[in-house]
Amino acid sequence: MNYYTAPMEGLTDRIWRQAHQRWFGAPGAPARYYAPFISPPENRVLIKKKMAELDPAANPGAPAIPQLLAKDGALAAWMIGELRKMGYTEVNLNFGCPSGTVTAKGKGAGMLRDLSKLEVFLDEVFSQAEGPISVKTRLGVTSPEEFEAILDLYDRYPICELTIHPRVMRQLYRGEADRAAFAKYLPHCKMPVCYNGDITTPAQLKALEAEFPNLSGIMVGRGIIADPALLRQAVGGAPASKEELRGYLDELYHGYTEAFGMASCAVSRMKAHWHYLIQRFEGSEAFEKQLRKAREGWEYEVVVNQLFTLPLL
């Protein structure tokens, strides 16, 4: 079974990928890091600063896989070609992002609203681009039943791997992932399938693996931010120690400070990580408000020092 990390905007950037690989990476865990989506520029002029996220030199260790967010198939095919020039083999297409700012533009899971347009997009991509192309998708916009027609469309193309997040667009991340719908449609998938959604513990991951042994992979998202050692434990490694977590978080903080040029900007990014990670510390409720209110680097550092006096759960 392959284990992957999900693309999450504002969380799984190159700084995180480097720190995670250094502190918690294990052979095959993860096998791939999927990078947060990029949108191809309409003028077809790449911005060096934005592309730095995908500089192969900045992504050592486990392979990083770029993800595209686009609704113009010809433009997406051009961008895939540019990524191939950078040395990337697989490129992932995003039909799963449920964010309102994304779907309002007809991108991400918004592509699932009109299957005729999605078909045109896929025709253009697969006729013009070369090499492996994978897809990350939701089940539909409002109902899981929509996936029957969506899958019928996907099955017509040489998708190298289909990652299914079994929620619909309107759910965002509310409610539970629909395992029953996933199980219903899995036998009808003609391509390798990866599961994504609501995997937060090694036990849950192993139970899913036992339930669906023919999956090509399992992708973890919020669970790997809440427990950076999740995949390491899945392959028999140790849980995260307090010392490892401290080193990992300090590396993230200093990396963001250097990248953004200001500690206050790094604090904002670190809060996104702590939103999931804070639950690992017993009694952390007493410090949640202080962490939310922290703006400057010194304020953040004071709260983090206090959090690390608490035992891990």
Model-derived segments and spans:
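Flavin-dependent oxidoreductase catalytic cores
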Residues: M1-L313
